[in-house]
Regions:
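Helix-loop-helix connectors at the membrane interface of multi-pass transporters/channels
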Residues: 1, 8, 82-87, 92, ...
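Membrane-interface "cap" regions at the ends of multi-pass membrane proteins
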Residues: 1-39, 43-48, 62-66, 78, ...
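Helix-loop-helix junctions that connect adjacent transmembrane segments
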Residues: 7-13, 51, 125-128, 160-295
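Hydrophobic transmembrane alpha-helices that form the core helical bundles
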Residues: 52-53, 62-145, 150, 170, ...
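TM-loop-TM module centered on a large, flexible mid-protein loop between adjacent transmembrane helices
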Residues: 83, 90, 121-122, 195-198, ...
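Membrane-interface loop-to-helix entry segments
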Residues: 117, 131-189, 219-220, 243-244, ...
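Hydrophobic alpha-helical segments of multi-pass membrane transport proteins
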Residues: 143, 166-172, 316, 369-399, ...
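C-terminal membrane-solvent junction of multi-pass transporters and transport-like membrane proteins
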Residues: 157-158, 328-339, 379-431
Length: 458
C-alpha cells in the first residue's frame, strides 16, 4: 500500500498554510464550550473537579491528535477521519462517523447561535433569542461563501482576537487571585482557596465523570486540522507544525483559564445562563470590562461557528465524493466552496435552532450533550483507524518511511480508545446529559443499518 496516492477528486484549492490550520482549529475549539459550558462544569463537578476534568480532556485530545497526525500526513485528503475509518475500519463505520460528525456540528452550530443570542440579551434584554440567532447564522453562512484563501484569513483574524482576549483574561484573573486587583466579596487575596472550598469532589466521582461530555464538547474542533489537509499547501510540513502548536496553545489556554475561573467563581454561582467570564470581570470591577468581554465572546462564537460550518460542509462533500450520498453534493463552485453541502448543513442547523429557542436553559445543555457524544464517536474512530492503517502499512513498508509517527503504537492508540470509552460511559450518570445517548445511539445504529441496506456491506 502506498501512502501518497490519496488525492481529492474535486477542485479544492490548496491555499492554507500551517498558521491557517492552527487558527482554523483554534477557531473551532474556543466557543461556547469554554465560554459558557465551563460554568456548568464548575457547578456540577466543583472547582477542583472542573480543573481535573479539563486536564483529563486535554490529555485525551492530545492522544487523539497523535493518531490523526500520522493519518493526515500519510493521506492528506478532505474528509480526513471519515475516509480513514472507511478504509481501515469498515465502510459502514466511515459512513456512520461522517454523519455523526456532521450531526455534531449541526447541533453545535445551533447551540453556538443560541449562546450568542443569550449574550446579546445583556444589551438587548427585550429582543427574542431567535432574532439574534438568525443574524449570527446569516453572518456565518456569508463568511463561508468566501474562497478558502479569504476564508482562512478571516478565520485567522477572528481567532486571533479571542486568543489575545483569553490571554488578557488569564492575566487579569491571576492579578485578582493574588490580590493585586480587587475582587468583589473578598478583603484579602482569594488565592486558590475556592478550588477546594467545597471539597475536592463535592458531587463525588460521579460528578466528575458526568461532566466529561461537556469537556469533550469544549475541545471539539481541534480535529479540523485533519479535515482541512485536502486544502493545505505542503501538508507533510504544515500538518505536524499545526498539530504541535495548536495542542500546546489549547492545553495552556484551557487549563489556565479553568484554574482562574475555578479560583474566582463560587460553585453556587456557576451555570450556563450567564458567561462565567463576564461574572468574573464584573466582580473585578473593571469599567465596561464585562461588556468588552461579552463582545469578545461573541466574536469567539462567530469564529467557532464559521469553522463548524466549514467542517460540516466538507464532511458532506467527502461522503458525496465517495459515492455514499448524492453526487450532486460533490459539486464545488468557482470559489472552491461546496455550496450545496453548506446549504444542506444550514438547513439542519435551522431545524435544531428552532427546537432550542423556547427553552435555552435546558435545550442548550441537551444540544451540547448530543454534540459532545457525536464528537467522541468521531474521535474514537481516529485511533482505531490509525491502528488499522499502521497494520496495513507495515505489510509493505517500514515505520521509518512515515513522515509523522504516533509514538508507542499500537499501545498509545489503544489507551486513547479506552479513555474515550470511559468518557462515553460517564454520560449515563448525568440526567441532563443523557440526551446524547438517547439521540446519538439510535442515530448511530440507524447509519449502520441504512448503509447496509443501501450498499450491502457493513
Amino acid at each position: 500500500m502506498e501512502n501518497h496516492n490519496f488525492e481529492n477528486q474535486g477542485t479544492f484549492n490548496r491555499e492554507m498554510n500551517s498558521r491557517h490550520l492552527q487558527m482554523l482549529s483554534i477557531g473551532g475549539v474556543i466557543g461556547t464550550g469554554l465560554f459558557l459550558s465551563s460554568g456548568y462544569t464548575i457547578a456540577q463537578a466543583g472547582p477542583f473537579g472542573a480543573v481535573a476534568a479539563y486536564l483529563f480532556g486535554a490529555v485525551m485530545v492530545y492522544l487523539v491528535m497523535f493518531s490523526l497526525g500520522e493519518l493526515s500526513v500519510a493521506m492528506p485528503v478532505t474528509g480526513s477521519f471519515h475516509t480513514y475509518a472507511t478504509k481501515f475500519i469498515s465502510p459502514g463505520t466511515g459512513f456512520m462517523v461522517a454523519w455523526m460528525y456532521w450531526l455534531c456540528w449541526v447541533v453545535a452550530l445551533a447551540s453556538q447561535f443560541v449562546g450568542a443570542a443569550q449574550l446579546m440579551q445583556r444589551w438587548f434584554p427585550s429582543v427574542p433569542i431567535w432574532v439574534f440567532a438568525t443574524i449570527f447564522a446569516v453572518i456565518v453562512f456569508g463568511l463561508n461563501t468566501l474562497s478558502v484563501g479569504w476564508f482562512a484569513k478571516a478565520e485567522d483574524a477572528l481567532s486571533s482576537i479571542k486568543v489575545y482576549a483569553i490571554a488578557a483574561f488569564i492575566v487579569l484573573g491571576t492579578l485578582a487571585i493574588f490580590g493585586i486587583l480587587p475582587f468583589e466579596g473578598t478583603n484579602a487575596a482569594p488565592l486558590f482557596n475556592n478550588i477546594t472550598s467545597n471539597g475536592l469532589l463535592p458531587n463525588g466521582l460521579v460528578g466528575l465523570i458526568s461532566v466529561m461530555l461537556s469537556v469533550n464538547y469544549a475541545f471539539s474542533g481541534v480535529e479540523m486540522i485533519g479535515i482541512a489537509t485536502g486544502e493545505t499547501d505542503n501538508p507533510q510540513k504544515a500538518v505536524p507544525q499545526a498539530i504541535k502548536s495548536t495542542i500546546g496553545l489549547l492545553v495552556i489556554f484551557f487549563v489556565l483559564t479553568i484554574v482562574v475561573l475555578a479560583s474566582l467563581l463560587p460553585m453556587s454561582e456557576a451555570g450556563v445562563t450567564e458567561a462565567p467570564f463576564v461574572l468574573v470581570l464584573d466582580k473585578i470591577g473593571f469599567p465596561y470590562a464585562a461588556d468588552i468581554m461579552n463582545f469578545i465572546i461573541l466574536t469567539a462564537i462567530l469564529s467557532a461557528s464559521t469553522s463548524g460550518l466549514y467542517a460540516s460542509s466538507r464532511m458532506l462533500w467527502s461522503l458525496a465524493n465517495e459515492g455514499m450520498i448524492s453526487k450532486e453534493l460533490v459539486k464545488i463552485n468557482k470559489h472552491g466552496v461546496p455550496m450545496r453541502g453548506m446549504i444542506l448543513s444550514m438547513i439542519g442547523v435551522v431545524i435544531a435552532l428552532i427546537a432550542s429557542i423556547y427553552a435555552e436553559d435546558t435545550i442548550f445543555l441537551a444540544l451540547v450533550s448530543i454534540a459532545g457524544f457525536a464528537v467522541v464517536i468521531a474521535w474514537l474512530a481516529i485511533p482505531l483507524a490509525q491502528i488499522g492503517f499502521r497494520r496495513e502499512f507495515l505489510k509493505t513498508h517500514s515505520v521509518d518511511e512515515l513522515e509523522y509517527k504516533t509514538p508507542f503504537s499500537p499501545t498509545l492508540p489503544w489507551i486513547t480508545v479506552i479513555l474515550l470509552v470511559i468518557s462515553i460511559i460517564g454520560i449515563g450518570w448525568d440526567p441532563s446529559q443523557r440526551a446524547g445517548l438517547y439521540f446519538g445511539v439510535p442515530f448511530m445504529i440507524g447509519c449502520y443499518i441504512y448503509h447496509y441496506i443501501r450498499f450491502k456491506k457493513w
